[in-house]
Amino acid sequence: MTYLFTVLELLSFLVPVLLAVAFLTLVERKVLGYMQFRKGPNIVGPYGLLQPFADGLKLFIKETLKPSTASPYLFFLSPLLFMALALLLWNLMPVHTPTLNFQLSLLLVLGLSSLSVYAILGSGWAANSKYSLIGAIRAVAQTISYEISLALILLSLIIITSSFNLTYIMNAQEFSWFALSCLPLFYIWFVSTLAETNRAPFDLTEGESEIVSGYNVEYAGGPFALFFIAEYANIILMNLFSVVIFLGGPWPANELFPLNVLTIGLKTTLLVFLFLWVRAAYPRFRYDQLMFLTWKSYLPLSIGALCATITIVLTLGIYLPLF
């Protein structure tokens, strides 16, 4: 019976995530449409609200094709792994009560999010296409490069709070958000999450003018839909993660259910809208600019912030002044 409740709890958490992903695709197309002085999808259902379901149905009833020279097992295993990792990480987020609560939950999130690199590289290599492989190599290099800055920023917050537990880090912001007291770190974090999720202006893995569609160029039907769903689930997840560690989670409604869940949802929605605004407003970076930004700008700043944090904590023996 306990296992049944655990499975039901997992499903009750994941179904809203999948619905949020479905409507995020619609919101993105609507936002981009209005920013470009057009309406966006408005035919399927009232105001185009049924468009995500029409798109999903179309993708999943299409024939699943595989290139004749592709690796048969890895080609289909990669999208499944990518999707599984995207959904697994949601269970560690302290929204009301985390489904999986560990003392080292922050390290687990960092480790599991790094595993998505293997799914991307596997899909690029298994397709046996030069465009797929170039896109996969770009994605891996980009993800690994920006994860270093993200890890150093997280290390600074770990030293401030003396904890690896996401719930504790969230509750430590009861009087002030880390986004206010560590504003430069929050800026670096936000831009790095754009690169980590392969979003514009860092979407070089899917540079249409160069490599068609990147690592998923040979995918069609269901496997392509899995990549698409996982990609958008990761966008919402990274913004939820940002809310938890920088924007105080459900504060000021910490103990008031369901207000605490609604507060987290509102903050996450605002950050997701920023992602969409950046996509509409900024052109794509060149690859050398992308690497210059992380290795010569963000990495030195992250290391400097870490050294400053260690110095302040050792000198004063207290947390950073939160104001």
From Swiss-Prot:
Main location: mitochondrion
Reaction(s) catalysed by this chain's protein: a ubiquinone + NADH + 5 H(+)(in) = a ubiquinol + NAD(+) + 4 H(+)(out)
Membrane topology: Multi-pass membrane protein
Segments traversing the membrane: 4-24, 73-93, 106-126, 150-170, 175-195, 226-246, 256-276, 303-323
EC number: 7.1.1.2
Keywords: Electron transport, Membrane, Mitochondrion, Mitochondrion inner membrane, NAD, Respiratory chain, Translocase, Transmembrane, Transmembrane helix, Transport, Ubiquinone
One Gene Ontology biological process: aerobic respiration
Localization per record: Mitochondrion inner membrane
Entry GO CC: mitochondrial inner membrane
Single GO molecular function: NADH dehydrogenase (ubiquinone) activity
Domain of life of the source: Eukaryota
Pfam families: NADHdh (PF00146)
EC class of the enzyme, as a word: translocase
This protein's record includes keyword Signal: no
Family note: Belongs to the complex I subunit 1 family.
Name the UniProt record assigns to this protein: NADH-ubiquinone oxidoreductase chain 1
Biological source species: Paracentrotus lividus
Gene coding for it: ND1
